[in-house]
């Protein structure tokens, strides 16, 4: 089961890694596309910068030309002092007019260039906007890919949570097993302690039992010795008693014999008495004598009887004393037997307890063996679970590393995108700010230059007018006689004043033109500001879209967390199904592996077949090349033969014409047939040659 579980974990991890790898490949491709588009965008930016530089250079060139025109006009206005110089000034004026026309043409050309550059700039702006739209589309695609990757990450998170729940289950099982192992270890320790206590109790009981047995054995030996002594004494006493009894029996027998003899004598005497009574008279004396003798004998018998009765009483007392001693001995023996029975009962009880303790020890040993086997099995299961846990932890670590790497990559990509967007925003702001600043600076420079030119022209005119007035005053003070000359000079001065006025009017017209150009520049500046505002609004919209996307991502993450919690709840229900599915997946994986092996074999076969086909193709190509060469040779031969045949046909036609000119109609009818036959023969020869 552990191997199956590890296989399922690795299979699930391998199945989960496929969409992650696809997402990573797609992200890498998109990164490459973004890098290429960034390069193109940078090239466009460089082109725009170059165009702006050219525009600035053109403006500076136009300002320089205007300065040169102003200087030329100043020279022309200052060159009208003398008549000799007037011709030169006229020539210079013509040249300057020509140059002015050329400058106007150059201005028009520059305006055309400016218009073309502005069109190019607008086209570049449109291209930039198109690229921005493309970038937005790419961003949307990246967002969709990110969503797919997020979905894959969610799946990975779900599988991680499943693996974590399985790890928690394994850990709970391991904890329960550890608790059981600890409890069993505690029970083992208790059993060992009980065994030690029982062994100590057994040792103490065995010692007590051995000491009691020794005491009993010593007591038994003493009692046996006492009993043996008592038996020996009893035997001795019994022998003595038997001897005495035999003596008494012999005496009793003797007395019985004597009594029988006496009874026989008494009977004889009674018979004699009967005989004597029969002989009463005759024998009273003898009877009396015999009565006296009988009385003496009876008295003697009475004495003997008394003696016998005394001896019998004495013997009865001895017997009673012996009986009492025997009873005492029997009581002692019974007491000893009871003590022996008690000792034997104690020994039997102790032996039964010892046997019970031995059985308990055996049972405890069997339980210990069973517990050891269970502990060994539990240790093996614990090792297997540890290995499974390590495998699961490894897979979890791999998945976590993959997730962390993917999350880091996504964060890095997100940061890069944000940094790129910020950089784009900053670059756009900087570009347009630089453009605005450059335009402001250029317009201010142009306005300042025009104002400086006008002021310089006015100051130069004023200085010239003051110098002329001073010269006129000096001349008026010096020569009153040359009043006509002075009048002429005054007329000249008036004419110079008219020229100055015309120059002033020209300057005012130039100032109006400059003001109009300033107004146009202001309008262009306003348009540029509007474009900048539109771009800023566009970028603000992009930023708002990014913020909306961020909020949507955060909401999705929130919903994802809620779904993860729901999935955690559902995961507890689907664990049994997961086990079944893992078994089915293992079977499918095995089938897939077998199919992969078969596919690899087929792929190898196809590779070999492809190699054979490539070799055949190479050989076929060589044969085709040879055939093409032969076809080319045959075509060349056919072309040559056709050319020869055409030449022959031309010759035949010429010959036919000659024959027509020389021969009649009938022969003409036959000759075309011959010519057709010759042509058919020539064609068949061509076919045979081909």
Swiss-Prot record:
Protein's UniProt name: Ectopic P granules protein 2
Record's subcellular location: Cytoplasm
Region spans: Disordered: 666-690
Free-text note on domains in this protein's UniProt record: The LIR motifs (LC3-interacting region) are required for its interaction with lgg-1 and lgg-2.
Organism (species): Caenorhabditis elegans
Biased segments, Basic and acidic residues type: 671-684
Highest taxon listed in the record's lineage: Eukaryota
Gene disruption phenotype: No colocalization of P-granule components with lgg-1. Furthermore, there is an accumulation of pgl-3 positive P-granules in somatic cells of embryos. RNAi-mediated knockdown results in increased lgg-2-positive autophagosomes following fertilization and at later embryonic stages.
Cell wall biogenesis/degradation found in the keyword field: no
Region (Required for interaction with lgg-1), start-end ranges: 381-385
Motif annotated as LIR 2, chain positions: 684-687
